[in-house]
Each structure stands twice: as structure tokens, then as C-alpha cells.
Amino acid sequence: MEHHNSHLLPGGSEKMYYIAHQQPMLRNEDDNYQEGYFIRPDPASLIYNTTALPADDEGSNYGYGSTTTLSGLQFETYNITVMMNFSCDDYDLLSEDMWSSAYFKIIVYMLYIPIFIFALIGNGTVCYIVYSTPRMRTVTNYFIASLAIGDILMSFFCVPSSFISLFILNYWPFGLALCHFVNYSQAVSVLVSAYTLVAISIDRYIAIMWPLKPRITKRYATFIIAGVWFIALATALPIPIVSGLDIPMSPWHTKCEKYICREMWPSRTQEYYYTLSLFALQFVVPLGVLIFTYARITIRVWAKRPPGEAETNRDQRMARSKRKMVKMMLTVVIVFTCCWLPFNILQLLLNDEEFAHWDPLPYVWFAFHWLAMSHCCYNPIIYCYMNARFRSGFVQLMHRMPGLRRWCCLRSVGDRMNATSGTGPALPLNRMNTSTTYISARRKPRATSLRANPLSCGETSPLR
């Protein structure tokens, strides 16, 4: 049985993509040609790379009836010839399409499984550090913990279900309840991230522009976080209402009764305006606020003091601390924008029928989908790299784990031996006090060694 990746359209052979919301490339099937009809839905959102559909006539092995009618879609009918002699069991072995090959599935596993693992571990560690360390319980860190919870929601529910159903199985195996929840949680997670970044920028803006004003208290910050989640849940509420299971216009899905999870809007107009509104609420408005606040903050923090104005060491330390925090949050904002903005712009462009027939579209959609899903594992890396307290919390947590503690101890012992023998980087030399007093002579050596090396192999200092 030979498989082709083309469609027979009126006036010649042309490749075409079916469009259906929230779905990726599907399988190609053209076998044993016979007269039928080609049904093309009006484009809605994402790609079906599939072939023509048969009519419900006597010569068909099966036909589309009312079971594959999609509400709100307009159909055009063409005469075509369709091949359909295949079975559900041997399809994977016979398909030569790139999206169904074993090599592509291996690539998908290698790209998405690390995101799932690193995002859960990293964001879980961020939450643990914030809530278990008293000095880390600041207003900004509460907002950062809210960001981490949103990323955990995305990584635990959306990442595995999306790549398994879209790229591995090509159908939805998780049931109707998870179909509603996964689509809902993805929108909620993005909205929470956007609104929390806005809350952080406003908190930083007030603290830097009006330093004498009362700061936002921790209690007030918890109310803001609850409000952010409530607004995100309310804004994304239409998505689980219109989500459901459906058999797409693909011969393989129809014959094998394989369902997909998608949004089924009553009309394309409603879908378009909601998608446009969601794009504005997720990106346009938050980015406008973030650009304004961080531009003013940058001018104030990096501006030089007027000549003749005194600047103490304390002022310099506070200015450096503010610059570090602003740099870290700016990095978080830039990474969020670079990861999610291309995918959401693509969602809007898919409403254009001419763009939906663009040949490289499946590859662009796959790349942008991976980029958007990968965002949930980047923030912990940024915190660890750009914030000394988070970095210290990560190190102390590693010392509490037996396997990692042994590795860290062996590494630190090796560094000390290399420094002693001169083969490695030398440890910093501390000035030794040669004068001995009565109090220093009575001091216990063990206490001195613990102060000098609080993270020794035998002891683990508590997170404070």
C-alpha cells in the first residue's frame, strides 16, 4: 500500500491543510482511489495535515454523516478520488509521513520530557525556598512563588498531555474531564504569569519612585495574588465551556473512532473576537504596563546623582541591590514575551485562510508550540543565576539530599586539595589575627570551624 502526501483539488493537484482549533498536524491518508467528495472547513485555528474526505455513498467503505459535522464551520464540496483501504492496527507501520515516523517521536520525547522534569523540580524548589525560609518571605518573592505555581500547573497538566496527544498518538486519550481542564489550565497559567509580572513591576515602581511611601505588606500581597488568580480564572472561563471531544475530518480518525480535544465555538466570529480579546489581555495590556514601569525604573535606578550630592556606602549597596532585582525581573519579562508572543501571534494569523495554506506552517507551529511549553522551566534558572539568596537556597537544599550532598562534599574536598597542591584554583586567603587574648583563647575550635564552613559535609545549616 503506497501513501502519498498530496490532495486532488479541482483543476490539478495541490497540497492543503485542514484547520481546526487547538490541534496540530495529523496523519496523511490517501489509498485506493474512488469517487467521493472533498470537504474543506473554513479555517479556524490549527493544522490538520490530512487528506480528502469521502462521501456517504455505496462505493465507500465508510462515509461522513452527521457524526463529523463541526458546528460553526462552513463547508465546500469538490469531486475527488480517495484511497481508504487501511486498518487501524497496521496504520503506524504503513505510514511514511514524517510526523508519524519513529524518529520524529523520539525527537518529541527528547524535547518535551526534560521540560516536564526540570519545570516540576525547579518551580517546586522555588516554592519550597520561599515558604520555608523566613528571610525569603518578601512581597516580591511571594509574587515569584505565584509565578512558580502557575508554571507547575502548566508543566504538570499541559506539557505531557499536549505532546502525547498531538505528536505521539494523534488523538486525545485522557477523557472529557481532562480535555476541559487542560485547555483551561493553559490559558489560566499564561494569564497568571502576565498579571503577576505586572503586579511585581508596580510594586517595584512604587518602591523605587516613591521610597518614602508605605510598602505593600505581605498580607496585602496575598490579596493581590488571590485577585490575580481570580481574574485569570474568570477571563479563561469560556475555554472549558466550548472545549470538547470531537472526531476530526480525517478518514483515519473517523474509521478508528479516535477523538481529539478541541474548542468548538458556535460561530467563527465569536471565536475570533474572544481570541483577539484574550491576546490583548494576555500580552498587549500587560506589556504596555511593563514597558512603562520598567522604563521609568531603569531611568531612576541607573541615573547618576546630581553633582555635590553625598552618597554613602549604604546608598551604594541599596542601589546595587535594586539594580540586581530590576535586571532579574526584566529578564523574566523578556523570556516570557519571547516564549509566548510568537505562538499567540500565530494563533491570530491562523484565522487568515491564505496563511493557513502556507506549506511550512506545520513546522512553524511545532517550533512555536515547543517554545511556549518550554517557558515553564526557565524562571528557576533565572532566579538561581541572578539572585544570590535563591542560589544559596538551591545549594542548601542540595546538601539536604543524601546523593547530592555526597557529590557536593566530594567536589568541595577536591577543590581544597587542588588549592593546597597548587593544581587548581586557589582558595581565598584570610588574614590571620596573631594576637591572642583571654577570650579568644577560651573560644572552642569547633565553633570557629563551623563559622568558617557553614556548609560542611557533616552538617547542614538550616534555611533561614
Swiss-Prot record:
Extracellular compartment residues: 1-105, 170-189, 243-274, 351-363
Spans through the membrane: 106-126, 149-169, 190-210, 222-242, 275-295, 330-350, 364-384
Record-linked PROSITE patterns: G_PROTEIN_RECEP_F1_1, G_PROTEIN_RECEP_F1_2
Location, primary (coarse class): membrane
Topology Cytoplasmic: residue spans: 127-148, 211-221, 296-329, 385-464
GO cellular component: membrane; plasma membrane
CDD domains recorded: 7tmA_PR4-like
InterPro entries tied to this protein: GPCR_Rhodpsn (IPR000276), GPCR_Rhodpsn_7TM (IPR017452), NPY_rcpt (IPR000611)
Keyword set, alphabetical order: Cell membrane, G-protein coupled receptor, Glycoprotein, Membrane, Receptor, Transducer, Transmembrane, Transmembrane helix
Membrane topology category: Multi-pass membrane protein
One Pfam family here: 7tm_1
Signal peptide: none
Protein's cellular compartments: Cell membrane
GO terms under biological process: G protein-coupled receptor signaling pathway; neuropeptide signaling pathway
An example molecular function term from Gene Ontology annotations: neuropeptide receptor activity
Residues annotated as glycosylated: 49, 79, 85, 183
Similarity-based family: Belongs to the G-protein coupled receptor 1 family.
PANTHER family referenced in this protein's UniProt entry, alphabetically: G-PROTEIN COUPLED RECEPTOR, RYAMIDE RECEPTOR
Job description of the protein: Receptor for the neuropeptides RYamide-1 and RYamide-2. The activity of this receptor is mediated by G proteins which activate a phosphatidyl-inositol-calcium second messenger system. RYamide signaling may suppress feeding behavior.
Name this protein carries in UniProt: RYamide receptor
Protein species of origin: Drosophila melanogaster
The gene coding this protein: RYa-R
